[in-house]
């Protein structure tokens, strides 16, 4: 593997470990020329996917772009990084298992919205507002009205919570 610091082709693997979810291998490497250390991550790619954009262009599927979008939506939310990574891995597995080589950007966006809706309502609204390009406050109102409350995620106290105990 080529060193990202000096470009030398000769690097050595010093340590290899499976990730927590078991879908990737992290390798710690050292360059024999400049002695810099760096980490690589290897993932199994079941098939080459391409994305069909709304304007008809086809581009290679970019897992990192999907991961960045998910992380932006979940920024400052109480969702651990490991959970975020599992969410992205699950989305990628769904896409790969679909049997399709070309997937529309609309389908990817819809899958991401559905997954975020299950994980965190605020992240869902954030992602959806960017993905659907909300330009008016009414769009936010409509999506909030359409959301069904998820059990255990209510901010309003139940009637029993408001009563004081004697």
From Swiss-Prot:
Q: Report unnamed zinc finger ranges.
A: 3-34
The protein's UniProt keywords, in alphabetical order, are:
ATP-binding, DNA-binding, Metal-binding, Nucleotide-binding, Repressor, Transcription, Transcription regulation, Zinc, Zinc-finger
Q: Where is the ATP-cone domain?
A: 49-139
What does the record give as cofactor?
A: Zn(2+)
Q: Does the keyword Metal-binding apply?
A: yes
Annotated segments matching region Disordered: 146-166
Q: Which GO terms describe its molecular function?
A: ATP binding; DNA binding; zinc ion binding
- One biological process term in Gene Ontology: negative regulation of DNA-templated transcription
By its UniProt entry, which InterPro entries does this protein fall under?
ATP-cone_dom (IPR005144), NrdR-like_N (IPR055173), RNR_NrdR-like (IPR003796)
Question: Bound how, and how many: what does the cofactor note say?
Answer: Binds 1 zinc ion.
The family line of this record is:
Belongs to the NrdR family.
Function per UniProt: Negatively regulates transcription of bacterial ribonucleotide reductase nrd genes and operons by binding to NrdR-boxes.
Q: What is this protein called?
A: Transcriptional repressor NrdR
Q: What is the lineage of its organism?
A: Bacteria, Pseudomonadati, Pseudomonadota, Alphaproteobacteria, Acetobacterales
């Amino acid at each position: 593997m080529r060193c990202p610091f000096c470009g030398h082709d000769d690097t050595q693997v010093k340590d290899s470990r499976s990730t927590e979810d078991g879908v990737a291998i992290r390798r710690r490497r050292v360059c024999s020329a400049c002695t810099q250390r760096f980490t690589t991550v290897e993932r199994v790619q079941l098939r080459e996917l391409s994305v069909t954009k709304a304007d008809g262009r086809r581009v290679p599927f970019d897992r990192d772009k999907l991961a960045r979008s998910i992380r932006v939506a979940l920024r400052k939310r109480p969702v651990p990084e490991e959970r975020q990574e599992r969410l992205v891995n699950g989305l990628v597995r769904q896409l790969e298992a679909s049997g399709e080589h070309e997937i529309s950007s609309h389908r990817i966006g819809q899958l991401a919205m559905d997954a975020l809706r299950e994980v965190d309502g605020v992240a869902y609204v954030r992602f959806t507002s960017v993905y659907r390009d909300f330009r008016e406050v009414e769009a936010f109102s409509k999506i909030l009205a359409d959301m069904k409350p998820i059990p255990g995620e209510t901010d309003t106290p139940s009637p029993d919570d408001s009563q004081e105990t004697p």
